[in-house]
Regions:
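C-terminal soluble interaction/assembly domains
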Residues: 56, 71-159
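A small/polar active-site loop signature that marks catalytic segments
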Residues: 1-82, 86-87, 92-100
């Protein structure tokens, strides 16, 4: 915001971050995802910006060993310049495990879909009888999207 101007309206979120993230993960709201991402740049002080948020995110990724496996260009996940390896995303799931209950996915599972033109992803956690809770990443190109769910069900049946 230009110096000297005052905001016309300031919205204060009444829901907790956990509540916002749960709804975000259910509804796949790209706008809210990007707004949450922009807020992490606020930790540097002053106005939030994409540049600040990328700086914070990249520092966090590097400090957790993700520098080579995850690349973020924006916070909604719709940019083709956002890239990840399955191993990198599985590592994120490992760190996110204490918050796995935020996922409310397909068929009542703890998973999240991702869809771009020609790319279908399903990632999350599955409770198994012999291995307990396991994390999984299925990312496929050139399919109708339903294959990722059939693969998950086949994997769950074997675990």
């Amino acid at each position: 915001m230009p110096e000297g101007l005052k905001p016309v309206y300031v919205h204060r979120q009444s829901r907790t971050l956990s509540q916002v993230l749960t709804q975000l993960l259910i509804a796949s709201n790209n706008y809210i995802a990007n707004q949450v991402f922009l807020e992490i740049g606020g930790t540097l002080g002053g106005q939030v910006s994409l540049e600040k948020s990328l700086k914070v995110a990249n520092a966090m990724l590097a400090s957790n060993g993700f520098a080579d496996s995850i690349h973020i260009e924006e916070g909604s996940g719709i940019s083709r310049d956002n890239r990840f390896t399955a191993r990198g995303l599985a590592h994120v799931l490992e760190l996110f495990a204490p918050h796995a209950d935020l996922f409310h996915g397909h068929d009542g599972g703890m998973n999240k879909t991702g869809t771009l033109d020609g790319v279908r992803t399903l990632t999350g956690y599955a409770d198994t009888s012999s291995h307990g809770r396991v994390r999984f990443v299925i990312s496929l190109t050139g399919n109708d999207g339903e294959l990722r769910f059939r693969l998950l069900h086949a994997i769950e049946a074997e675990l």
